[in-house]
C-alpha cells in the first residue's frame, strides 16, 4: 500500500516538475506535520527559493510532495536567498515587499562550494549528485533515493521544552554515532517556520495569476541558533560515542509564531559540509 501511495505521489510530482513554468492552482499544496523516524536514514532537502522567482512556487510544492513521499526520512528547509528573494519596492508593492532572508541562508547561498547560482535550486544532504552539489528540482527525487541508500551513521534525538511565559525554547540534542567516523563533525540547529502567508510570483507574462497574493510558505528558514555551520561535537568519533548539546532560544523579540515553528538539527562533516543525519521536532509539542 505504501508503494502505491509513493507511485501516486511521484506521478503528481512529475506533473508539477513538467509544469514548472505555469501557475500553481489553489490550495497550492497541503502540508502534513512529520517528525524524524530515528530508526531510518534521514535526508535534508534544502530548497533555495525566492518570492520573485516564477518557478519557485512549483518547486516548493515538489519539495513538500517529496517530504510526504518519504515521510519521516526527508526534511525540508526553505531557504529564501539570492536576488529573487529581495523585497520588491518598485514593481509589485505591496504584495512582494516582505523580506524572508536571514543571515544564515545568505551565507549558505553565497558558499562557492554549494554553487547555488539560481532559484529554484536545491541540495540533498549537501552531497554531490551527477557531479553537482546543487541542482534543479527535477533531480531532487533521484538524489534523495541515492542519499537514502547510504548507510546510517548516527542516531539522533531531540527534546524541546517551551516556556510560554518568557517565550523561550530549550532543546537537548543527543547524537549517537553508530560507526566510527574520520574527521570533525558539526551539529547545526536551525529554526524553521510554517504557514507564513505572502506574495509569490507564479507565472510568465500573460498568466492569469501572475502573483499568488496569499501563498503559504512552509519550512521557512529563520536562522541557526548555534552558528552558520553549527559547532563541533566530535573529532574522529568512535562507534557508540554519544554527544549531547543543549541550547535555549528566545522568541520574545521575534515576530515568528512559536506554534508554527520547529527546530531542525543536522550533523555534518565539518570539512565537506555533507549532512550525515537530520532530525526535526516542533517547538511546542502538540
Segments from the language model and where they lie:
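Local sequence-structure signature of Cys/Sec-based thiol-disulfide redox active-site neighborhoods
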Residues: 34-84
